[in-house]
């Protein structure tokens, strides 16, 4: 029986990836379809991906698959063929190719079985996730942005919205997708007669959100096909104005893809114009925040003086201090509440 999980340390794997000479392509894809045996499917797909030297993060559940991966360019066409023939439901599935890509997005393959491919908190047996809103392509998106009867809804987290979003899009203030869904219904009641356009990074969240809105009585619901990634790619290919402003946050080592030249966010420590996310260098904190190069140097990559001082302690003392809190911090390191409690975010610099 082959080993169906990684047994090499992260440091060794990362060093091996960085030493690679062959370029890689970063890809994301998802598909809602019924998987009778997620664990069996996971194990079979793991062997296919491992044989092709695929790195990345893949979630499987009874409701489908969600993947963010990198593939050696010489094996990209073979990967595409094997994925499309793995299951009839995956034949022709849209592959979102990264917009900015140095091939260093992942260094290990992790495949997990979960209850849902997107944690939505929905516990309603009458909900039909397949009853989704209509797709919008790039030209349609631009037309909707000029339609006074349309309302754009950003179904991403606060830290994603902060660095980039569509013009005049509404933010749903919540830390997680499961918290956003009921809030979106509540916030949009006053816009029930409007055209509701939902979007996210690659399409997986806004597709389910569109079905949830329809389930709650909204009739005029659309979502952007392929999310921000596919919109920007198609708009550029077709010579259309790109109406997304700023950076598209991504969940890998890059932490973002530049869509437009505008920098709409600010350093959380000094207020300077900046949209570069980082995790606090103190492993006992790991807070996700925006930090400019000057503050990165001043605070040694940390989010605060306290974390900077802790990072300077002997390693044994650091381990003692973070015992019992490290896992919790890594789980909640993106919450708005924790960000506000750790940092007194200044007003943007003049």
Swiss-Prot record:
Q: Which InterPro entries match?
A: Rhodanese-like_dom, Rhodanese-like_dom_sf, Rhodanese_C, TrhO, TRHO_N
Provide a GO biological process annotation: tRNA modification
What residues make up the catalytic site?
200 (cysteine persulfide intermediate)
Question: Domain Rhodanese spans what residues?
Answer: 146-240
Q: Which reaction does it catalyse?
A: uridine(34) in tRNA + AH2 + O2 = 5-hydroxyuridine(34) in tRNA + A + H2O
Q: Where is this region: Disordered?
A: 319-350
Report the CDD domains cross-referenced here. RHOD_YceA (cd01518)
UniProt superkingdom:
Bacteria
Which protein are we looking at?
tRNA uridine(34) hydroxylase
- Organism in which the protein naturally occurs: Salmonella typhimurium (strain LT2 / SGSC1412 / ATCC 700720)
């Amino acid at each position: 029986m082959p080993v169906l999980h990684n047994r090499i340390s992260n440091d060794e794997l990362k060093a091996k990836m960085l030493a690679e000479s062959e370029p890689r392509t970063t890809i994301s894809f998802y598909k809602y379809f019924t998987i009778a045996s997620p664990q069996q499917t996971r194990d079979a797909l793991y062997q296919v991906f491992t044989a092709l030297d695929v790195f990345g993060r893949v979630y499987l559940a009874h409701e489908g698959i969600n993947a963010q991966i990198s593939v050696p360019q010489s094996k990209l066409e073979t990967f595409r063929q094997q994925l499309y023939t793995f299951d009839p439901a995956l034949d022709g599935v849209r592959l979102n190719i990264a917009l900015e890509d140095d091939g260093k997005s992942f260094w290990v393959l992790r495949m997990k079985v979960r209850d849902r491919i997107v944690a939505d908190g929905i516990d309603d047996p009458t909900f039909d996730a397949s009853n989704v809103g209509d797709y919008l392509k790039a030209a349609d998106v631009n037309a909707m942005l000029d339609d006074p009867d349309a309302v754009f809804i950003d179904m991403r987290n606060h830290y994603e919205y902060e660095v980039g979003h569509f013009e005049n899009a509404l933010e749903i203030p919540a830390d997680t997708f499961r918290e956003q869904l009921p809030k979106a219904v509540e916030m949009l009641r006053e816009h029930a007669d409007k055209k509701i356009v939902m979007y996210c990074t690659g399409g997986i969240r806004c597709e389910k959100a569109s079905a949830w809105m329809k389930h709650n009585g909204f009739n005029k619901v659309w979502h952007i096909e392929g999310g921000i990634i596919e919109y920007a790619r198609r708009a550029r290919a077709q010579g259309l104005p790109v109406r997304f402003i700023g950076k598209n946050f991504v969940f890998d080592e890059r932490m973002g893809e530049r869509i437009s030249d505008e920098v709409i966010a600010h350093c959380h420590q000094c207020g300077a114009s900046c949209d570069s996310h980082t995790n606090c260098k103190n492993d006992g904190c790991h807070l996700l925040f925006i930090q400019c190069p000057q503050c990165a140097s001043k605070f040694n990559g940390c989010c605060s003086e306290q974390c900077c001082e802790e990072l300077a302690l002997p390693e044994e003392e650091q381990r003692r201090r973070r015992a019992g809190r490290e896992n919790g911090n890594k789980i909640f390191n993106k919450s708005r509440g924790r960000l506000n409690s750790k940092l007194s975010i200044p007003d943007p610099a003049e």
